[in-house]
Amino acid sequence: MISALLGRSKSELEEWAVAQGQPAFRGRQLHDWLYAKGVRDLQGITVLPKAWRASLQNEGVSVGRLHEQERRVSADATTKLLLGTEDGETLETVGIPTDQRLTVCVSSQVGCPMACRFCATGKGGLQRSLAGHEIVAQVLSIREVMERRPSHVVFMGMGEPLLNIEAVLESIRCLNDDLGIGQRRITVSTVGVPHTLPRLADLALKQLGRAQFTLAVSLHAPNQALREELIPTAKTYPYDALLDDCRYYLNKTGRRVSFEYILLGGVNDHPHHASELADRVGGFQSHVNLIAYNPIEEEEFQRPTTQRIEGFRRVLERRGVAVSLRASRGLDQDAACGQLRRNRRS
């Protein structure tokens, strides 16, 4: 017996409807109401027989949507939602609009066990991993609130996606097949967990038939010593081993790897850091995405100066490294990962 309908494919819903003693077309109706119409509860699916809806509700079956608890909208229209789960946990998701696209930043866990020193989410530890349908529900919540169809999804919210690979891949299948978001418009970001990058490549090819989503690996330092200072779990994952696993992923999937590098003022933003980073990733089929630090309260790190940011980028460009600078969004509304939830709990 399933408890949440969201996250199921059309064929799964058809088979389930038949197993419930209903005709297969009831499954197709469910699929339409779940994904196209975005229904929030069973009673809202008025095309289904009333008696069946009541029976399902009595059996504990639900749509599987999340409940909005707080909303913040910044001056640039970036929208952050604090969402509640059925078991009383809270998580964050962010809608980032431009003229041409709407990107949804989703969480893969409630909290995070990685404890990166510069990250608000890591301050509270891990509560649990999210189910696949809870990830999909975040995208539907942003679509509902912003009244726009999401075009891109990035797994850059709360949690470490590679500690929840099965649910992440389940959600990617659903986002692609049921919500029509192409895999090439989906990015999975990881700080790096030993042995999981090869597993991600292998499972994606096995379960999805292809691995066309973008893999973004968070480096945040040009050497092992500094990386261990910023990311405690890096002590168990040497830099060279991480890059070897990235090469495996590249060779297995044929997809270029993106390297994320958060610039922390006076910590890892010096030109010699940029030169050292170029030594690491030069010749690697990759792209470096620079991110200026988004300050959180009661934290020792600071946002680097514009001069430092541009200087870092110029060093990489001169070394032939493909590089871009991510625009900061929602700075006035606690839009960095974990800030809203942390402030709500404090």
Curated annotation (Swiss-Prot):
<dbReference type="InterPro" id="IPR007197">
    <property type="entry name" value="rSAM"/>
</dbReference>
<dbReference type="GO" id="GO:0000049">
    <property type="term" value="F:tRNA binding"/>
</dbReference>
<keyword id="KW-0489">Methyltransferase</keyword>
<feature type="domain" description="Radical SAM core">
    <location>
        <begin position="98"/>
        <end position="332"/>
    </location>
</feature>
<dbReference type="GO" id="GO:0070040">
    <property type="term" value="F:rRNA (adenine(2503)-C2-)-methyltransferase activity"/>
</dbReference>
<feature type="active site" description="S-methylcysteine intermediate">
    <location>
        <position position="337"/>
    </location>
</feature>
<keyword id="KW-0819">tRNA processing</keyword>
<dbReference type="InterPro" id="IPR004383">
    <property type="entry name" value="rRNA_lsu_MTrfase_RlmN/Cfr"/>
</dbReference>
<dbReference type="Pfam" id="PF21016">
    <property type="entry name" value="RlmN_N"/>
</dbReference>
<dbReference type="GO" id="GO:0046872">
    <property type="term" value="F:metal ion binding"/>
</dbReference>
<dbReference type="GO" id="GO:0070475">
    <property type="term" value="P:rRNA base methylation"/>
</dbReference>
<comment type="similarity">
    <text>Belongs to the radical SAM superfamily. RlmN family.</text>
</comment>
<comment type="function">
    <text>Specifically methylates position 2 of adenine 2503 in 23S rRNA and position 2 of adenine 37 in tRNAs.</text>
</comment>
<dbReference type="GO" id="GO:0002935">
    <property type="term" value="F:tRNA (adenine(37)-C2)-methyltransferase activity"/>
</dbReference>
<feature type="binding site">
    <location>
        <position position="116"/>
    </location>
    <ligand>
        <name>[4Fe-4S] cluster</name>
    </ligand>
</feature>
<dbReference type="InterPro" id="IPR040072">
    <property type="entry name" value="Methyltransferase_A"/>
</dbReference>
<feature type="disulfide bond" description="(transient)">
    <location>
        <begin position="105"/>
        <end position="337"/>
    </location>
</feature>
<dbReference type="InterPro" id="IPR027492">
    <property type="entry name" value="RNA_MTrfase_RlmN"/>
</dbReference>
<keyword id="KW-0808">Transferase</keyword>
<dbReference type="GO" id="GO:0019843">
    <property type="term" value="F:rRNA binding"/>
</dbReference>
<dbReference type="GO" id="GO:0051539">
    <property type="term" value="F:4 iron, 4 sulfur cluster binding"/>
</dbReference>
<keyword id="KW-1015">Disulfide bond</keyword>
<feature type="binding site">
    <location>
        <position position="189"/>
    </location>
    <ligand>
        <name>S-adenosyl-L-methionine</name>
    </ligand>
</feature>
<keyword id="KW-0698">rRNA processing</keyword>
<protein>
    <recommendedName>
        <fullName>Probable dual-specificity RNA methyltransferase RlmN</fullName>
        <ecNumber>2.1.1.192</ecNumber>
    </recommendedName>
</protein>
<feature type="active site" description="Proton acceptor">
    <location>
        <position position="92"/>
    </location>
</feature>
<feature type="binding site">
    <location>
        <position position="119"/>
    </location>
    <ligand>
        <name>[4Fe-4S] cluster</name>
    </ligand>
</feature>
<keyword id="KW-0963">Cytoplasm</keyword>
<dbReference type="InterPro" id="IPR013785">
    <property type="entry name" value="Aldolase_TIM"/>
</dbReference>
<feature type="binding site">
    <location>
        <position position="112"/>
    </location>
    <ligand>
        <name>[4Fe-4S] cluster</name>
    </ligand>
</feature>
<feature type="binding site">
    <location>
        <begin position="159"/>
        <end position="160"/>
    </location>
    <ligand>
        <name>S-adenosyl-L-methionine</name>
    </ligand>
</feature>
<dbReference type="Pfam" id="PF04055">
    <property type="entry name" value="Radical_SAM"/>
</dbReference>
<dbReference type="InterPro" id="IPR048641">
    <property type="entry name" value="RlmN_N"/>
</dbReference>
<keyword id="KW-0004">4Fe-4S</keyword>
<feature type="binding site">
    <location>
        <begin position="218"/>
        <end position="220"/>
    </location>
    <ligand>
        <name>S-adenosyl-L-methionine</name>
    </ligand>
</feature>
<keyword id="KW-0408">Iron</keyword>
<keyword id="KW-0949">S-adenosyl-L-methionine</keyword>
<keyword id="KW-0479">Metal-binding</keyword>
<keyword id="KW-0411">Iron-sulfur</keyword>
<dbReference type="GO" id="GO:0030488">
    <property type="term" value="P:tRNA methylation"/>
</dbReference>
<feature type="binding site">
    <location>
        <position position="294"/>
    </location>
    <ligand>
        <name>S-adenosyl-L-methionine</name>
    </ligand>
</feature>
<dbReference type="GO" id="GO:0005737">
    <property type="term" value="C:cytoplasm"/>
</dbReference>
